[in-house]
Curated annotation (Swiss-Prot):
GO terms for cellular component: cytoplasm. It catalyses: pseudouridine(1915) in 23S rRNA + S-adenosyl-L-methionine = N(3)-methylpseudouridine(1915) in 23S rRNA + S-adenosyl-L-homocysteine + H(+). This is Ribosomal RNA large subunit methyltransferase H. GO terms for molecular function: rRNA (pseudouridine-N3-)-methyltransferase activity. It is found in: Cytoplasm. It comes from Flavobacterium psychrophilum (strain ATCC 49511 / DSM 21280 / CIP 103535 / JIP02/86).
Length: 157
């Protein structure tokens, strides 16, 4: 199985980017992982929230194939403990999915078209984080999930 994380806009903070790169490298020992950044939409100030979501949605959907399984990182998604999340990763791997695609949307969430294509929504927390920080937190949780599956000493109960 491959895992792809799609996010809108580049990571501006160099310190965050360094940590994202570190966990991406660590994750590559367990699974093929791609972080795909969609460029910020130009002239966003001239768009309504709905128009911005629709434009971002078109770009997101252009990055997936019909066989990809799409899961959204969404504030209204289901929350998991790290162990339960690792169990979900194992189930997805066992199911024969070729590519599992997680998406971090823009500031206003996702378009209706993106929601229609999703296989689920997960939330990292009831708290709100910047979208740039969510990238780091989520990639770290992927890494943690695989260390749990391999019984490696990264995660402590």
């Amino acid at each position: 199985m491959n895992i792809k994380l799609i996010a809108i806009g580049k990571t501006d903070n160099k310190n965050l980017q360094t940590l994202i790169d570190d966990y991406t490298k660590r994750l590559s020992f367990y699974i093929k992982f791609d972080l795909e950044i969609i460029a910020d939409i130009k002239n966003v100030k001239n768009l309504s929230e709905t128009q911005q979501k629709e434009k971002e949605g078109e770009l997101i959907l252009s990055k997936i194939t019909p066989t990809d399984q799409l899961i959204l990182l969404d504030e209204n998604g289901k929350t998991f403990s790290s162990v339960a999340f690792s169990d979900q990763l194992q189930k997805k791997m066992n199911s024969g999915i070729k590519t599992l695609v997680f998406v971090i949307g823009g500031p206003y969430g996702f378009s209706d078209d993106v929601y229609k294509k999703t296989f689920g929504k997960i939330s990292l927390s009831q708290m709100t984080f910047s979208h740039q920080m969510v990238r780091l937190f989520f990639i770290e949780q992927l890494y943690r999930g695989f260390t749990i599956l391999k019984n490696e000493p990264y995660h402590h109960q």
